[in-house]
């Protein structure tokens, strides 16, 4: 054969081989050990994760949910310390609804954020954006030995891209995990701060007075001042529908609810399953005898006692249904 024709045939054949190797339609075989390092990185990426939700144990004070008011008043300013906040009531399943706190102790908020809302708030502050987990394999070539296209082979050779993807997603998972843990801490701290008002004794008032040092209101007070805005400070401050509890309403609370004593307060749970906190203190009822006032003594026992009009005692308002 003529040497010129032989050389031309070799050139043409080489070109055809090169073209066939670079075609996407052709496949190459990859052995067992060729992609050990690459597969290890992919396995590490697939193993990366972050918390996907919250558990019941993440809420350190679940009892607060049963104590949160169902309805709040407009913002009020307490007389004793001049603190602004809100009063609200809880339906214990009795003839009246009981305020969640004593007069003079107010909630700083009317809405409590959930754990999920706290996490979203924190992620917004940190600028965390959603990121999908990188994918470098499919069912066809996820294990080795395998056959893959030449284009897939070239992509798979970029170990640096794999490392970069791993680092980005690993940082994302660590940031998400940190935000999740910080959200739990923030949520519980906020819950504690927002519910401290439940345990406060509040302001002390003389019976029949509309201010902490108003002793003049008792001169012409009726035997029961409940709902009378001239003498009932709960009605005067909170408005229509609110009043000091009568002796009978206190008795109903004592008889029909479960009382659990702690160091300096009671948790009182009604037939509805809802609860209120009653700090250990003396409490006024709305009733008098003509010479003395019926009070409720809540310390080591729960009992009615007679006292003077000028005694500065706590008031736990009620709301009529």
Task: Name each region found by the language model.
Residues 1-5:
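Positively charged n-region of N-terminal signal peptides that target proteins for export
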Residues 18-20:
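C-terminal motif of bacterial Sec signal peptides marking the signal peptidase cleavage site
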Residues 88-90:
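Short boundary motifs at domain starts and secondary-structure transition points
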Residues 6-14:
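Sec-dependent N-terminal signal peptides
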Residues 22-26, 32, 36-42, 52, ...:
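C-terminal, surface-exposed recognition/capping segments
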Residues 54-58:
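Ser/Thr/Gly/Pro-rich low-complexity, disordered linker/stalk segments of secreted
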